[in-house]
């Protein structure tokens, strides 16, 4: 549409391969602009300046904040803001098990740690991580549609699953989780229509990272 050249990278490398290729191109062509959402400080700052204050304004009684671990921008930006308002707020990251795939999320033990996570002292900021499997993510994605009328994506279902796990572990509290993507991106995956076994198998074949 805009005359841009599309540069493909090996599918087996997932988005990590695309990021590495983009980094190499940025070095080769310093006059080009590489936004780099995994490293660009504007990512967490957007959440520090907007999402965090909105949550605090609407839910000042928040005790736990749950979000998926992708670029880590949401967790770092919102998390830092909430901690500055109330140091007792617990910050929980949601990630898939090592070797399993949930779209939009990553397990830090798989070798790629987003620069934002390191630059914003993510290891110190987070209280804990909750592991959510692909099947749980799809189940919760369907619940969001069927029970709440929210057409969200699979990583949003994972965040809901993580929030429910947190809720099962505490006696009382106020948990906020982030619906971070839209369902329109997953219409071809069968996540909303296939039986769960088929939907899970399809999700496992898609390489995101």
Residue ranges of predicted features:
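Gly/Ser-rich phosphate-binding catalytic loop and adjacent alpha/beta segment
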Residues: 1-26
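Active-site/ligand-binding loops adjacent to catalytic centers
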Residues: 3, 19, 31, 83-154, ...
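Hydrophobic/aromatic beta-strand patches that form the interior of the parallel beta-sheet core
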Residues: 7, 33-35, 66, 92, ...
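Glycine-rich beta-alpha junction loops
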Residues: 39-42, 70-73, 95-100, 109, ...
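Short, well-ordered alpha-helices that flank and scaffold nucleotide-derived cofactor binding pockets
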Residues: 57, 80, 84, 164-168
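Short glycine/serine/threonine-rich phosphate/pyrophosphate-binding segments
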Residues: 68-79, 155-163, 186
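Conserved active-site loop/cleft motifs that coordinate metal ions or position small ligands
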Residues: 151-154, 174-180
């Amino acid at each position: 549409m805009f005359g841009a050249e599309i540069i493909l990278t090996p599918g087996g490398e997932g988005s990590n391969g695309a990021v590495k290729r983009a980094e190499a191109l940025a070095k080769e062509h310093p006059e080009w602009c590489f936004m780099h959402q995994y490293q660009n400080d504007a990512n967490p700052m957007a959440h520090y300046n907007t999402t965090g204050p909105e949550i605090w304004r609407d839910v000042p009684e928040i005790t736990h904040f749950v979000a998926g671990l992708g670029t880590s921008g949401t967790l770092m930006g919102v998390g830092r803001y909430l901690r500055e308002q109330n140091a007792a707020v617990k910050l929980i990251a949601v990630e898939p098990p090592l070797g399993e795939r949930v779209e939009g999320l990553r397990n830090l033990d798989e070798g790629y740690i987003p620069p934002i996570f390191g630059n914003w002292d993510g290891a110190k900021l987070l209280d804990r991580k909750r592991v959510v499997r692909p099947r749980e993510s799809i189940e919760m994605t369907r619940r969001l549609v069927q029970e709440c009328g929210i057409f969200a994506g699979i990583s949003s279902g994972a965040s809901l699953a993580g929030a429910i796990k947190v809720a099962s572990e505490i006696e009382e509290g106020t948990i906020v989780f982030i619906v971070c993507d839209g369902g329109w991106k997953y219409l071809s995956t069968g996540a909303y229509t296939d039986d769960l076994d088929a939907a899970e198998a399809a999700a496992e074949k898609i390489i995101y990272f």
